[in-house]
Amino acid sequence: VDTFFKISERNSSVGNEVIGGLTTFLAMSYIIAVNPQMLVAAGMPFEAALTATCIGAAIMTIAMGLIANRPVALASGMGINAIVAYTLCLGGVNVDWRVAMAIVMLEGVVIFILVACGLRKAVMDAIPASLRHAIGIGIGLFIAFIGLKGGGVIVSSESTLLTLGDLSSPVAIVSIVAIAIAVILQVLNVKGGLLISIIAATIVGIPLGVTPLPTSWNFGLDFSAFAAPFQTIPGTDTMAIVQVFLQPALLLFVFSLLMSDFFDTMGTVVAVGQRGEFADKDGNVEDIQPILMVDSAAAAVGGFCGASSITTFVESASGAAAGARTGLSNIVVGLLFVVFAFFAPVIGMVSSSATCGALVVVGYLMLSDVAHIDWENIEHAFPAFACIMGIPMTYSITNGIGFGFISYVVIMLVTGRAKEVKPLMWVASLAFLLMFILA
């Protein structure tokens, strides 16, 4: 095991990998409850949605560990599942959920081809170092914001958009406890501190009524959503994937999902890489091609399984911060997904308040890259700023990256330095511009 996963070579241990895997799993475990809810809204049976979510995540997370040997876990991506449910199935498009999964699968196939041709890595290499740092910083703010919002520390406001929540509420109290424990253990350099904070906050939440207790157990698996793109649409004789080509307008959604997957993963991998010590100070990720290959295949597998697009999870950074350095942590995460396909109510006990501390600390750790940006050089600093602000403020990693790319190209153009912009940056920026226009 040590030789295969290079555990000692990367100054890790089996214990660190297990703790890192547990931390990552708990930080991303909300997807077990959230994704099926989204897919049920789209018309999929709950049991099928739960099985697809857990088994799809397990397969691709383990594949990432075995093939790329990096602590990068995968599951159904937030954002794309919302597009599937509320735009494709319930919005004006109003297609059957099987057709939506066919669109997701096609998007994954296209990305896989682009990665195989080296285009995705080439785009990453074309991104200026300042923007690579900005992506990680923006994601850090995004993660911290998600933690604070989910924990009731920050709440929505009609007058000011956001405001301070009721800190005397049980939800906020558990969140504050989680943050305090996570920060204190980080200061004391306690291994597995983030995991300890999640478990401790979950226990504290029981008497306060914040931690939901299991009321029933689901021991069955339902694979009826698997091969969804090749299933016949109810009431017709048409296979779902054929319907996509019978309605050419649906191919625009293939492009839209592709843009989101393409750049979300780039930002996530850089962010996790810097926490897991496999990305350098300029955001260049070591041995990135296998990571991108598995991630691109995951999108297609997600559509095939009926789980929506499966993608790398930025919550993997919490596991990396807890000590994960190899793919062994992915094996832990993958096996836990399989287990909780049967025992989903247990994961339901981990509330957003319990994970608040881990997400806030990870967000803090990711802000350290601010020091690597030359803030005196506005040609590079402003695009970085646009990216950093755009990610949390639009609740989208893709949008933030798009703001950074487009502003960088425009600034270099008007200052007469267009020749310094690499061709793929022009292409990517134009693609983002098209995406924003069509949105």
Give, region by region, the residue ranges found by the protein language model.
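Helix-loop-helix hairpins and the membrane-proximal interhelical loops
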Residues: 1-48, 162-164, 196-289, 433-434
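Helix-loop-helix junctions within the multi-pass membrane cores of secondary transporters/permeases
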Residues: 2-35, 56, 77-139, 272-370
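Transmembrane alpha-helix interface/packing and boundary motifs in multi-pass membrane proteins
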Residues: 60-72, 183-189, 256-264, 295-305, ...
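Residue-level signature of catalytic and energy-coupling elements of molecular machines
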Residues: 18, 38, 123, 192, ...
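Internal alpha-helical transmembrane segments of multi-pass membrane proteins, especially GPCRs
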Residues: 51, 102-105, 255, 293, ...
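Membrane-embedded alpha-helical modules
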Residues: 93-207, 211, 331-439
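Loop-to-helix transition at the N-terminal end of transmembrane alpha-helices
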Residues: 42-62
